[in-house]
Structure formats: structure tokens, C-alpha cells
């Protein structure tokens, strides 16, 4: 094993001198992988890697980046930040570098005479734009809810990184219907702590179970806050300082000045797309609930103030479809998901009642007599007789057969004399070896 360099030894000594909270803060700030924290030496070597130093410097503001060139005249706050990031060590006798001076060569090109750009607040969004932004956010909430419902009701294998397999994606598209970007929704739900894994399959987390009891505005706040917690520190600091700043050249100029090692053009482009998907910004202007997020205020309340009104229910038609004329409240979506099949997702969905959907409801514990009542609760018009007849017919046929398990044997009790004969003569059931043990009873 090669001996560590003098620089590595000095950094190891410094690491050993700081306390545990400081060490934990350093590891988090410099984004050190757990695998590199097995010893002070492995940690020091990772802190001294050129890539880690380069990425860490990118996140430091101008004032901190200028401090290493003249530490004696730097602000105490900047020196503390550099020491917390393991770039400088401060002692009563002065300051010393914890990394090679050559690793900080990018700082020599900084212009310490550059002028800070003027901040001009963005214009207020119109009522229509606020409503459109809220609709975008609510669409995301509904789509994530639909994804969680699908994962709760079926098994979807995942790959090594917790991503859905190609087969799972295909199954989810078939389950959810048109209008969903499964990959994007999966990432958002995972980032929010709603999706995890159980072995080789996707699974809901404890937080996902709590999600079901939240209002749509509280759900939105959770998604927005989770996303914002993962954005680069330079963006978080900029918007916290100026919550009303537009995401156009104004933001780019401010980032370029305050974080001179960041390339804002490429970085902000992808972040802007995410922010638009979440309804954080509308036409590059921050929404009121985005500003509430950056000011530490009530995001859910600000979002609810601009959210579109819920439709009173759905319109049922003779062809077994149920159409919404606007966003549906969570309780209406829950009822419809329990007894119908969703044909079109999104903010204004379309459902269809089928024999399979009614049978699934009965198997999930919905009583036969409650199906018509549930339909009346969510429909704004009279429930067509065809829907009631379908529910009654499926319930009647489902109740024609009872299955009971007794140790190693299974008993089938039929309520129609002819059903017993049908089951015995069914070629697909020959493998069960059904035997008649009574007028309406079979055993296998």
C-alpha cells in the first residue's frame, strides 16, 4: 500500500480534529458517498479528488470563492464556509489550504470588480395564468395518485436502480390508460418518498399510505417541497433571496454573477422544464405558491387559492361510460376507481363500468347492494338502468359460487343446480379433479 501524500496526511489530521456533527455536515455538503467514508484516509482521498473539488466549488457563491485568494481580508462568514467545506483551515496563527493550491486555479480567473446585476421583480401573473399553473400542478397530483393506486393493486418488477422494467412500464400503461408519462411520474413519486421497493418489485412507502388521507393541495405541497429539496444549492439560495425573480435572463444573470463557476444556461434549462411540470412557474414567472415555498410560507394554502373548482361528479351514459366535466375530488376518484375501469387519466378523466370492474370490486369487499348506491353518489344525473342491471347481473353470478378451504381440500358450493354440472364438465377444470359430494357441492 502506498503511503499518503503530505496533503492527504494534513487533511486526515484535520478531519480527526473536528467533531461528529461537523464531519456529518462536511460529508453531506461535499456529497461524499457512504463507500468513501470507511476511514479518514478514504474520506480524505475523496475530498481531494479533482472531480469532487470542481463540483463543490461550483456551488459556492462569489464571496466565498474570492476568499481563498486573500483569506486575511475575507469576511469571517466566507472563511467559515470554506473551512466547513474542507478547503481552508483556520488557526490562531492564520489560514492554511487543505487542498492543493493548484486545485483552486479556477478561482484565479474570477473578476472581483464585476458589478452585481439589478434585481427587477417579475410581473404578477394574471388570474388566468394562475389558474392554468394550478391546473398543471393538480394534474400532476392526480397522475401520481393514479400511479400509486396501480402499484398498490398489482406487482410491478423493478430493475437494479429501482426503475420499472420494460414489462412493468407496458403493464402500467395498460393499467393507467392514455395520458401518463410513467417514467417521469415514477421519478417524482420516488423523490417524494412515496415509492420504494420490496425485494424486486415496487412497493408503497409508509408516507404513501399517509398521502391517501391528504387533500389535493397538501399532496401538491409535498411534491413541490420534495422536488425543491433536491435542486442545486445555487438555485435554492437565489430564489430564497429573490422569490419574485423571473426564470429568464434575469435569473441567468444573477446566477452567473453570484455563482461564477456555474453554467446557468444549461442548468436552468432542465430545471425550468421540471418547474413548469410542477406548476412552480408559468411563462417563466413564479406562481404565488412557488413564492410561498421560497419564503417558507403555507404552500398548500397558496395553491388551493388558485386551484380549479371540483366538478360535482360525473355523467353516466347508457354505454357504461362515466364522464367528468372538470377535476374530480379525491373521494369521487376513490369511489370510481373502486367500481369502474379508468379509460382516460389526467385532470378530467373518463371511466367505464365493466363486468370485470364490478367483479373486482366485489372481490375487494364491496357489497353487491352498495354498488348502485356508490354510483348514485358520484353521478350528477340518474344512473342508467343498464348500469344497475350490469351490477346486479355480475353480483348474482358471483354469488352463485362459494369457495371454502378445509386443510388440503377445497369445497365449492353452488346456488344453481346446473352450475355444478357445468363445472364438472368444463375441460379447463379437469385438472382439479372435481367430485360431487352433494346436490350443490363439489370437492377437490
Identify what each model region corresponds to.
Residues 1-261:
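Short, amphipathic alpha-helical interface elements at domain boundaries
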Residues 224-444:
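Extended alpha-helical interface modules used as scaffolds for assembling large macromolecular complexes
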Amino acid at each position: 500500500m502506498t503511503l499518503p501524500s503530505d496533503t492527504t496526511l494534513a487533511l486526515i489530521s484535520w478531519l480527526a480534529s473536528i467533531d461528529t456533527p461537523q464531519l456529518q455536515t462536511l460529508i453531506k455538503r461535499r456529497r461524499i458517498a457512504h463507500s468513501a467514508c470507511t476511514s479518514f484516509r478514504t474520506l480524505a482521498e475523496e475530498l481531494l479528488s479533482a472531480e469532487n473539488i470542481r463540483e463543490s466549488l461550483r456551488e459556492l457563491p462569489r464571496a466565498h470563492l474570492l476568499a481563498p485568494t486573500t483569506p486575511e481580508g475575507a469576511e469571517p462568514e466566507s472563511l467559515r464556509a470554506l473551512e466547513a467545506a474542507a478547503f481552508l483551515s483556520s488557526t490562531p496563527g492564520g489560514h492554511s489550504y487543505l487542498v492543493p493550491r493548484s486545485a483552486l486555479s479556477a478561482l484565479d480567473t474570477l473578476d472581483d470588480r464585476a458589478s452585481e446585476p439589478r434585481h427587477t421583480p417579475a410581473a404578477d401573473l394574471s388570474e388566468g395564468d394562475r389558474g392554468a399553473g394550478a391546473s398543471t400542478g393538480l394534474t400532476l397530483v392526480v397522475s401520481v395518485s393514479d400511479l400509486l393506486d396501480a402499484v398498490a393493486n398489482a406487482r410491478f418488477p423493478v430493475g437494479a436502480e429501482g426503475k420499472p422494467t420494460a414489462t412493468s412500464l407496458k403493464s402500467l400503461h395498460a393499467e393507467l390508460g392514455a395520458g401518463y408519462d410513467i417514467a417521469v411520474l415514477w421519478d417524482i413519486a420516488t423523490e417524494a418518498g412515496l415509492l420504494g421497493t420490496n425485494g424486486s418489485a415496487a412497493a408503497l412507502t409508509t408516507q404513501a399510505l399517509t398521502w391517501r388521507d391528504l387533500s389535493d393541495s397538501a399532496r401538491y405541497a409535498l411534491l413541490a417541497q420534495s422536488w425543491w429539496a433536491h435542486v442545486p444549492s445555487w438555485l435554492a439560495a437565489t430564489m430564497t433571496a429573490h422569490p419574485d425573480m423571473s426564470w429568464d435572463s434575469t435569473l441567468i444573470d444573477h446566477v452567473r454573477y453570484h455563482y461564477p463557476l456555474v453554467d446557468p444556461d444549461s442548468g436552468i434549462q432542465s430545471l425550468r422544464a421540471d418547474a413548469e411540470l410542477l406548476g412552480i412557474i408559468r411563462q417563466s414567472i413564479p406562481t404565488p405558491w412557488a413564492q410561498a415555498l421560497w419564503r417558507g410560507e403555507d404552500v398548500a394554502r397558496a395553491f388551493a387559492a388558485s386551484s380549479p373548482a371540483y366538478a360535482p361528479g360525473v355523467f353516466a351514459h347508457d354505454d357504461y361510460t362515466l364522464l367528468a366535466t372538470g377535476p374530480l375530488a379525491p373521494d369521487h376518484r376513490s369511489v370510481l376507481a373502486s367500481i369502474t375501469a379508468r379509460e382516460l387519466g389526467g385532470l378530467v378523466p373518463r371511466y367505464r363500468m365493466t363486468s370485470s370492474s364490478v367483479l373486482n370490486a366485489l372481490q375487494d369487499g364491496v357489497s353487491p347492494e352498495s354498488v348502485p348506491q356508490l354510483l348514485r353518489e358520484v353521478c350528477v344525473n340518474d344512473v342508467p338502468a343498464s348500469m344497475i342491471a350490469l351490477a346486479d347481473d355480475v353480483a348474482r353470478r358471483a354469488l352463485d359460487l362459494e369457495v371454502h378451504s378445509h386443510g388440503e381440500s377445497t369445497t365449492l358450493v353452488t346456488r344453481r343446480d346446473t352450475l355444478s354440472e357445468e363445472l364438472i364438465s368444463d375441460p379447463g377444470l379437469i385438472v382439479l379433479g372435481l367430485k360431487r359430494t352433494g346436490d350443490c357441492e363439489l370437492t377437490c
